[in-house]
Amino acid sequence: MGFLKLIEIENFKSYKGRQIIGPFHRFTAIIGPNGSGKSNLMDAISFVLGEKTSNLRVKTLRDLIHGAPVGKPAANRAFVSMVYSEDSGEEKVFSRVIVGGSSEYKINNKVVQLSEYSDSLEKLGILIKARNFLVFQGAVESIAMKNPKERTALFEEISRSGELAQEYDKRKKEMVKAEEDTQFNYHRKKNIAAERKEAKQEKEEAERYQRLKDEVARAQIQLQLFKLYHNESEIEKLNKELSVKNKGIEKDKKHMDKVEEELKDKKKELGKMMREQQAIEKEIKEKDAELNQKLPQYIKAKENPSHKIKKFRAAKKSLQNAQKQYKKRKADMDELEKEMLSVEKARQEFEERMEEESQSQGRDLTLEENQVKKYHRLKEEASKRAATLAQELEKFNRDQKADQDRLDLEERKKVETEAKIKQKLRELEENQKRIEKLEEYIATSKQSLEEQKNLEETLTEEVEMAKRRIDEINSELNQVMEQLGDARIDRQESSRQQRKAEIMESIKRLYPGSVYGRLIDLCQPTQKKYQIAVTKVLGKNMDAIIVDSEKTGRDCIQYIKEQRGEPETFLPLDYLEVKPTDERLRELKGAKLVIDVIRYEPPHIKKALQYACGNALVCDNVEDARRIAFGGHQRHKTVALDGTLFQKSGVISGGASDLKAKARRWDEKAVDKLKEKKERLTEELKEQMKAKRKEAELRQVQSQAHGLQMRLKYSQSDLEQTKTRHLAMNMQEKSKLESELANFSPRINDIKRIIQSRDREMKDLKEKMNQVEDEVFEEFCREIGVRNIREFEEEKVKRQNEIAKKRLEFENQKTRLGIQLDYEKNQLKEDQGKVQTWEQSVKKDDNEIEKLKKEEQRHMKIIDETMAQLQDLKNQHLAKKSEVNDKNHLMEDIRKKLGSANKEVTHLQKEVTAIETKLEQKRSDRHNLLQACKMSDIKLPLSKGTMDDISQEEGSSQGEESASSSQRSSTVYAKEALIEIDYSDLSEDLKDAVADDDIKQEMSALHQKINEQQSILQRISAPNMKAMEKLESVRDKFQETSDEFEAARKRAKKAKQAFEQTKKERFDRFNACFESVATNIDEIYKALSRNSSAQAFLGPENPEEPYLDGINYNCVAPGKRFRPMDNLSGGEKTVAALALLFAIHSYKPSPFFVLDEIDAALDNTNIGKVANYIKEQSMSNFQAIVISLKEEFYTKAESLIGVYPEQGDCVISKVLTFDLTKYPDANPNPND
């Protein structure tokens, strides 16, 4: 196998000038410090082997010239040449030159194209695109971290199967689309064939159906003309009769108008009174709410002063104690100041006396000059003789002074300890007083808390009783409301019904005489058995409110809106348009008019009842109701006793489950009693709600009790702490100080005994010294006339000592008194601060109590005023209520007069109503006939007007129409009256039928003929009338689809062949590479690991087309169990990645392998294994050129190429070579 012999570089990256690098051995290591240009050498090898510029860490080719990145290129060209030695010994030189901004390729100094250059390298086994000759820095770690899909991409790159990926995807899409088109055209062809067969059958059925349909249309026209002809004849007859009757009614109506005018005036007066009464009621409610709102405020204002007074008393007592303590301490301080003045005065007197004595004695003890000299000479001689004694005495004096200082210190400590004991006694006294105050406050708080608890229990009991009673009342009210209202009305509905009843009473009071009440309250079925049927017919009108006029209705609606009430239905008597009752219906057997089984009062609400009931009939059973509704030539609205309702339109509605509950409302006596019970319960509920409102007061009391409880808790805690901690601590400290004080006396006595003992010894020494002095001063003493020299000296020295001692006593007294005075001053200042604090607290509490009392009085005044105003309003309400009752009695008399007049008019109107009802029914019948013709598309022959003039509105029963619907019906009937029908096509035999029996017989015959023809049509399912056109269209589409299917089938076959060819080529490329790598990887991994137990596996996730999914790579490290790749250690992962790298290289291997720092992630153990493996492989399989920084690795190489930097404008790389074959390896066997 050939190998890379030399590399020649000129001005490439960090290599300035021309440099020859090599020769390269079978295993060469490139070493050098970081930044020296090692990787640039690898870039040079990559460059000469045709690598892209983007992979050489630069943007353009010019940047590869030395110095170009810093703007100082060393030349305008650069090149790299590679000398390759083949097995035969022949050498080939490959060069790549940078000229300007492009590359120039040469083989043996001959310029060639890139393709030829690449082909020559491929013949040597160097694949530029696959880069099978080099491994960049960090590639090992990258391979170790790859997931299965990324490994697949790596194999696609190595095997060059990825070059076919785009063509593969393109041809696969073309194949799938072609197959889908083929399938689509096949199903389309199949469906159109079925359509063609179906279209033939439809054409035959359509022709037969049209013939029958024409015959039915002609028969229907005859039937409708027959009905309309006789309907118009009857309408003309009834119009003449109605005109005669109406003239007789006008006269009687004038009398009624006069009585109604009188009633209207009285209504206005009553309305004014009712509004005044309602205004007073509103004010009473407002005042009651205001009182309930202000009562808790008054209770709170009443409670606040009592708590503040307790606090004030406690503060006042604390002030008195503080003042008492301040006065006592002030007296103690005054005593100390007096004592200080007394000591100062005694000191001054002593100083004056000493001055006088000094002057008198000074004259007596004056010596002559020669005597003084003699005294000093003799004194010096005496000192020399008694020197030993003097030294001993001096020692005693020093010891005596030290003990005296100790004595003074102990006595000072004793005085300080006594002062501290006094301070602790005062603190004990203060703590004792604090305990007394806390105990007093706790007792008071407990008493207050007990009172609050009692009040809370009382209020809680009242509120709970009120709540229980409210629940009981609500439960009873619910039962009452369920009986009064619908069975569907739930617990919330009862309050809604109550609200509606209140509004009803209000509008009755506001508009007396104009608002009659709800329809259900003004009428009653004649027998109980009719209750369900009447309830069903009245329906939603059952709760409608009847008023005298439209204006009253609108005023009531406005009032309900203002009161935020629920929507209500109003029936104004002057606005309703009612169809006359059809008198013929009273003659039907087995049925009665619903209006005939209802009693109503007052009489003038009949119009509203006619509007609600219409011409509805009530029957004993469902069969009769159905027969009468649909059995005759004319339909009727009927209802059975069980509530089953049959509409004219054909709609049937059964008796709902709640109908019986609604029907119970007719029980008048039960309703009255229930209403009375409801009113009584409502009043009681109001009273209990007042008691329940005390919840606010209860919460206030609970809050105050909680606050008191917390303060009591803190006070008890403070008391406990004061007793167990502060008091005990003070007692302990006092005991400790007393113990210390007791120890002072023995110590002081011991020191005094030592001092006294030493005094005796010092006296003895002094006497000895005196004897020596007496011997020396004997003659001198006789001369000056003293017994001994000490008399002379004591006169002067003793006096000075006594004076100094006395002065020291004075100073000690002043110091002691000053310390005590300063302490007392500080304590006095603290006591004065306490007095001021408590004085401020007392003053503040006093002011707050005054404010709270004023606030309590203000709230009490407001409550009294509010209660007085409330009582005054109640008195006004009683007076106004009495006036309203009187006015109501007067109006009742007028209503009776009006009722009598109305009965007379009603009697006269019955005949007119009967005629109007018949006439209206005939008009409705004509409208229904015309409408039926229009809806059924029956073309009537018309001499005036068109079919478009016929209204689409359905003629309904009176009970179902609203006022606006009645107006629209009249307009429709008037418009349709202008339509003239041409009866020339109607046979004369049908026109001549006059008697009812003849008309019924002819009509029955026409109906039977039509029914027979329609029966035949119904048995024939409606055909497609455009069947012929459909058949022609389907034939054309079938031929077109057949052609498209054949073309799509050919395209699919061609696309599949092309795809299979690309798929096979891609699979062959990929599989050849994969099988090679999979076969070699286990052996390579064992060799790298130096252990035959190591195992490595490669497996595709998709064996059929492995390049579409991932490739799994797993290794079993030596001496370990199988684990996923992610769970291997860092070193194990790196070795596994190298095994994969070398296995990939084994597929179409290049003659040399350049590796950049593959040992970076290896530990010392694995470095040796990898280095030995590369050394083995380099002997037989490939030449290895490795960049390395680790000694353990590059020492295994046959030669070293050292790269070192020199500094210039930019780094300049220099190269050294070193042949290691001359130096035997310490461990030459790579298997060890």
UniProtKB/Swiss-Prot annotation:
ATP binds at residues 32-39. Residues 350-369, 947-970 are annotated as: Disordered. Residues 515-629 form the SMC hinge domain. Residues 163-503, 660-935, 997-1068 form a coiled coil. Its main location: nucleus. InterPro entries: P-loop_NTPase (IPR027417), RecF/RecN/SMC_N (IPR003395), SMC (IPR024704), Smc1_ABC (IPR028468), SMC_hinge (IPR010935), SMC_hinge_sf (IPR036277). Involved in chromosome cohesion during cell cycle and in DNA repair. Central component of cohesin complex. The cohesin complex is required for the cohesion of sister chromatids after DNA replication. The cohesin complex apparently forms a large proteinaceous ring within which sister chromatids can be trapped. At anaphase, the complex is cleaved and dissociates from chromatin, allowing sister chromatids to segregate. This is Structural maintenance of chromosomes protein 1A. It comes from the Eukaryota. Gene3D superfamilies: 1.20.1060.20, 3.30.70.1620, P-loop containing nucleotide triphosphate hydrolases. The flexible SMC hinge domain, which separates the large intramolecular coiled coil regions, allows the heterotypic interaction with the corresponding domain of SMC3, forming a V-shaped heterodimer. The two heads of the heterodimer are then connected by different ends of the cleavable RAD21 protein, forming a ring structure. One of its GO terms (cellular component) is meiotic cohesin complex. GO terms for biological process: cell division; DNA repair; meiotic cell cycle; response to DNA damage checkpoint signaling; response to radiation; sister chromatid cohesion. CDD domains: ABC_SMC1_euk. Belongs to the SMC family. SMC1 subfamily. One of its GO terms (molecular function) is DNA binding. The keyword Coiled coil applies. Keywords: ATP-binding, Cell cycle, Cell division, Centromere, Chromosome, Coiled coil, DNA damage, DNA repair, Mitosis, Nucleotide-binding, Nucleus. Residues 953-970 have a biased composition (Low complexity). It is found in: Nucleus; Chromosome; Chromosome, Centromere. Forms a heterodimer with SMC3 in cohesin complex. The cohesin complex is composed of the SMC1A and SMC3 heterodimer attached via their SMC hinge domain, RAD21 which link them, and one STAG protein (STAG1 or STAG2), which interacts with RAD21. Pfam families: SMC_hinge, SMC_N.
